[in-house]
Amino acid sequence: MINKSEIIKEYGRAEGDTGSPEVQIALLTARINELNGHLKTHKKDHHSRRGLLKMVGRRRNLLAYLKEKDLEGYRALIAKLGLRK
């Protein structure tokens, strides 16, 4: 189970920062990883799979925005989350 407050504290720029792209990407990544585990055991859950694809698309858009605005922050975040190889 994801602990939102810990993720916000770790990736946020200030106390209670929930709107920055870094926090949003980290929260989406945690939810995506959790849903991936669910879909491994429930292969026919297509409703959840659609939600997963929507989350992945939203994370992709946020990553593109962050890459454009703050390249160093983008590189640090993907290294910390282990997203790109």
Curated annotation (Swiss-Prot):
Gene3D superfamilies hit by this protein: 6.10.250.3130, S15/NS1, RNA-binding
Endpoints of the signal sequence: none
Keywords per UniProt: Ribonucleoprotein, Ribosomal protein, RNA-binding, rRNA-binding
Claim: RNA-binding is one of the keywords in the record: yes
Molecular functions (GO terms): rRNA binding; structural constituent of ribosome
Transferase listed as a keyword: no
GO cellular component, as recorded: cytosolic small ribosomal subunit
PROSITE patterns according to UniProt: RIBOSOMAL_S15 (PS00362)
GO biological process terms on file: translation
CDD domains hit by this protein: Ribosomal_S15p_S13e
Subunit-level organization: Part of the 30S ribosomal subunit. Forms a bridge to the 50S subunit in the 70S ribosome, contacting the 23S rRNA.
Assigned protein family: Belongs to the universal ribosomal protein uS15 family.
NCBIfam families for this protein: S15_bact
Functional note: One of the primary rRNA binding proteins, it binds directly to 16S rRNA where it helps nucleate assembly of the platform of the 30S subunit by binding and bridging several RNA helices of the 16S rRNA.
Entry protein name: Small ribosomal subunit protein uS15
